[in-house]
Amino acid sequence: MIRYNPRGLSPNEVAESRRQHGDNVITPPKDDSVWKLLADKFRDPIIRILLLAAVLSLAIGFVHKDFTESIGIICAIILATCVGFWFEWDAMRRFRRLNQVNDDIPVKVMRDGAMHEVPRRDVVVGDVVYIESGETVPVDGELVEAVSLRINESTLTGELEVDKTVDEAHFDPDATYPSNVVLRGTTVADGYGVMVSTAVGDATEAGRVTEQATVQSEEQTPLNRQLTRLSKLIGRAGIVLSIAIFCVMLGKAIFINGLLEGDWLAISQHVLHIFMVSVAIIVMAVPEGLPMSITLSLAMSMRRMLKTNNLVRRMHACETMGAVTVICTDKTGTLTQNRMHVQELVRYDALPMHDFAEIVAANSTAFLDVTGAVIGNPTEGALLEWLHAQGEDYEPLRAGAKIVDRLTFSTERKYMATIIQSGISGRRIVCVKGAPEIVRAMCAPDGKDEQVAEQLLGFQGRAMRTLAVAWAETAEDDCQRAVAAAQLHFAGVAASSDPVREDVPEAVGRCLKAGIDVKIVTGDTPATAREIARQIGLWNDARDTDRNHMTGTEFAAMSDEELLGRVQELKIMSRARPLDKQRLVRLLQQCGEVVAVTGDGTNDAPALNFANVGLSMGSGTSVAKDASDITLLDDSFASIATAVMWGRSLYRNIQRFVLFQLTINFAAILICFVGAVFGTDMPLTVVQILWVNIIMDTFAAMAMASLPPNPEVMLEKPRPRNEFIITRAMARTLFTCGIIMVAVLLGMLFWWTITTGGLTVRQLTLFFSTFVFLQFWNMFNAKGFETRHSVFSCLRGCREFFLILLAIAVGQVLIVEFGGEVFRTEPLAWREWAVIIGSTSLIAVGGEIVRAIGRKR
C-alpha cells in the first residue's frame, strides 16, 4: 500500500508537485484552424485537376484575350471549396457548444492538516483526496481507505459497478484495473473513499487515452480513393484526346491543306492554333461542376442527417458510412441503457407486498431524483424503480421507518443490514440485503435450497447481478449482533442487468442483413458480453465457438500476425482495455475492412479517432466526442443503421451525378473532336458551355442530393473496397447516351450545313437548346440508375427533384429568350420549343423502356 501523510501536503510541497507534474488539466485536441479547414478542401483530386485546367485556360485566355472560361473555372473552384469549408466550420461550431468541459469542479483535499475545497485543475500528485457517492474521481490515485466503495467505470471499462477495497485479500484478480486503484473520469456509485493522487492531467489513464485519440490514421476515405482514380482517368483521357486532335489536325494541315508550303511565320501561327485547340480539349475534359456538386451532395446530406439525430462533424463521414463493412461497438451506453434494471424479482416468503417494500426502501441509501434518475448505487436504485413499478412509493415508506442502526455494504462482508422500527407494523426488524450465497447462509432452513440454487444458476447463465433480501424480528439495536442472533427469513432474490436498448436488436439485424459485421468490444465480463450479444441477435450458442470470442488479455498476448487470421471471425472482445480496441481497428483495416467504431466513454476515444468513421454518443464523454466524426444525438444504435443507409444512398446519388456530368463532357468532347477534324467552329460558345458545365450541373447535383435515401440499399452487400466509382453499367449507359446525343446533334449540324451552306444564330440557338434539353431528360436516366422502380414513381418523395428540374427548364427558356448577344441566342417560337422538348424526351423514354426490360429479366 502507498505511504501517505494523513495531514496531506504542505503549501511548499503542493507548489513543488505542481512544478514537477503540472496542472490537472488534460490537453484538449487542437481544433483545425480556419485556414487548415480551407486548405484541406484543395486536397481533393478533382479540385487539383481543376486548378491545372484553370492555369491552361488562363494561358489560352492570354493568347485570345478572352478570360471568360478561366473566370468560370476559378469561380467553380472557389464555390466548391467555400461551400465545403462553410458546412464543416458550422458543424465544428455546433460541436463546440455541445462539448464544453468544466475543470473548475470543486474537489475535497486534505492539505497541511486542514480540509480544503480546490478546483479540479489544482489537484496535484501526492494530494490526499476525499471522494464520496455521486462525485467524479478527479485524478488517478491509490486508495488508502475505502468504505463500501463502488466505482462506475463505464467510461473506461464499460462496467457500471466495480467494488474497490484496500484489503488485498479481497482484490479481484480478473479486474481490468487493480481493486485499490481509482481513475480520473470514473464516478463514485456508492460509498466513500480516501485516495492519494498518483497522476494528474495528461499522465492519467484518461490523459493517455486522450493523447492516443489525437493520433491521425493515414487511411484515405473511400470516396477520395475513387475520386483520385477518376481524376487520373479524366486527366489521361484528356491528354490522349488532346494528342489525337493535335496529330489529326496537324496531319490534315500538312497533307490536305499544304501547310508546309507557306512561310515559317504562317506555319508557326497555324501550329500554335492547333496546339491551343488541343489544349482546349483538356480543359473541356475536366468536369468543372463535379467538385462543387459532390460538395453540395455531402453538405446537403450533413444537414438532412442532423434531422435523424446524426451530427456530422467531418463531411467525408457522410459517404464513408455507406462503405462500412465492420462496426466495432462498445456495450455500455450504446447497446445497453447504461442503467441497472430489475429484470426479475422472485419472492420466497408470504410477507405482504407493502411490508416487503418497506424492507427494501429502508435498507437502501439510493434515491431517485425528480426526473427518475438514480442517485447512489445503481443496483439499489434499480430496486427502488422496481418498487415504483409495483405501485409502491419508497419515500413515505423510508420516512415512516425509524432507523435504529445500519451496517453499510463492504466488499469483505458482501451484505448490508439496517435495523428499523417499522412504520407499518411497529415491530423492530433487521433488514439484510447482499450476495445470495452469503445471505442464504444466514437464513433459517425453509426447504427451498434446491429451488433457490436452480433459480440463481438461471440468473447467472443470463449474466445478471443478483441481490438477496432477508429479514427477521429482533430486539437488538446493533446490526452485527442482530444478524448473528436472528434466524433470517429469506424474502426473495432480485436479478438486475443493464438492459438492451429496445431498438438495438432490430438495428443490429439491419446491419447484418446489409452485410456489415458487428463486433462488441467491452471491458465487461465474458458472460455479460455474451449474454448481451445473444439478446441482440449477434451470438448463437449452437453456431458460435470460442474462436468468435476473446478476452483483452488473450488479445494482448497474441502477435499481429496471429491476430490477422482471427480478427475477422471475432464477434466479442471482453475485458478489453482502451488501446485493445484501437489495435483491433488497425488490424481490421489491414484486412481490407472499412471500420466504423461506436462509443461513449474515454476508453473508446483512440479507436474512434483511428476508425474510418468514429461515432460517439451525445451523452458520452467530451474526449469520445472530440475523437469522433459523427455524434449520435439520441445515443441510439438505430441511428447508426440510418447513417449507413444515408451513406449508401449518398454514394449512389454521387454515382448518378457522375454519370450525368460525364455524359455531358463525353458528348461535348466528341462534338468538339469531330468539329476540329472537319474544320468547323465549335457550335457552343464558352458562356453556353459554362452554363451547362457549372450552373446547370450545380442544379443537377442539388436535384440528385435531394433524392430521399432508399431503404433498398440496406438489402445489398457493402461495395467492394476497390470498386471504381464508374461501374460497367454506368460506362454502358454513359457511352450509349453520349453517342446517341452526339449523333443527333452532329446530324443537325451537317443537315444545316448541307441545306443552308452555313449556320445562322437561330440554328445555333436550336442546337444549344436541343443540347441542354437532351441533358435535362438524361437526368431522368441518371435518377433511374440502379433502381428497381420507374423514375416517375414515388413523385411525392422527390418533390425537390422535380422543382429543381423545373428551375433548369425555366432558366434555359429565359436564357434563350433574353440572353441575346451574351449567350449568342435569339427567341424561339412556342412550336419550336414544343418540338425540342418533345423530341429530346425520347432519350428518357428510351431509358425507361430499357430499364423496364431489365427489371423483367
Region roles according to the model:
Residues 696, 741-742, 765-780:
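Generic alpha-helical transmembrane segments
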Residues 760-764:
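Transmembrane alpha-helix entry/boundary detector in multi-pass membrane proteins
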Residues 1-717, 725-726, 739, 753-754, ...:
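Conserved cytosolic headpiece of P-type ATPases
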Residues 750-759:
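Long hydrophobic segments that form regular secondary structure
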Residues 720-734:
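Hydrophobic alpha-helical transmembrane segments and their immediately adjacent juxtamembrane loops
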